[in-house]
Structures are given as structure tokens and as C-alpha cells.
Amino acid sequence: MINESLHKSINKNIKKVRIHSSGDFFSGKYLRCWLAVARLNPQLKFYCYSKSLNLFGSNVSIPNNFYLTASVGGKYDALIHKGYFKRYAIVVNSVIEAETLGILHRNKPYNIDHDDSSCFKDDAFALLLHGVQPKGSKASQDLQKIRSLKNG
């Protein structure tokens, strides 16, 4: 069903498919469906961000055209810290925070990804705070600063 939907909604110029612009894998069965779709479509690059890292155990075979970026900030962050995921993303509030946390975590600054290109490299990276944040929160204020710098 996922494969049918995919083929109905893409054209031949599409080379990359992002799985979930928001949301995550909710079960091993659902993850295996996406892995099967990737195997059926070797001409496409499938990529995703996930905090459901427990689903990507040693018994899961990931095809070469499937790019997982582990997202820091979830229940299974210990798997990232133990080195099971070379490619991971951390959300930061500023360029300075990306530099500081990168040096603290891995002795070099995190590069900030602006276009999802880092999802195809085997290295950790940062994403600037994005999306919707609780009204009046520090994150909301930081997001307003980020947006004003982009527009300014």
C-alpha cells in the first residue's frame, strides 16, 4: 500500500523521498514496510529522522538507499552516545550553541544543516530550532530570533 501510494504521487524527476516530515516509526512492522519499499525502489534515496532508535536493532537489515538520521532528544539517546548511529542530528537554538555543543560532545563544532543534505553523510550535524514551539517559552523566543536573523 505504501509503495502504491508512493508511485501515484511521484514523478520520474523525484530522486529523494523523505519519510515523515513530522512523526516517526511507531512499530517494527511499520519500519519493515518502509524498508521493503526502499528495496523495491533502488533508484530512489529514502531518508528519515527518528527517535524510535530501539526499532533499528541488529536484526534489521537496512538497504543502501535508506538513510536514517538518529534524532537527539528522545528516550533512546543512549544508543547514539554508545556509537550505534554515526549520523545523528541535534536541534540547537543558535550557531553558537552548535559550536559549543559540538566541541563538548565530539571535539569539533556541529555543522548546521539547512537543506537536508547532511542526511546523506556519515557525520553528526545540527539543525536550528524549527517548527511550532509553546507560546511564551524560551524556545519560542529563540525561534523568533532565528526567523528574524533569516529575514533581516
Give residue spans per PLM region.
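Class I S-adenosyl-L-methionine
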Residues: 1-152
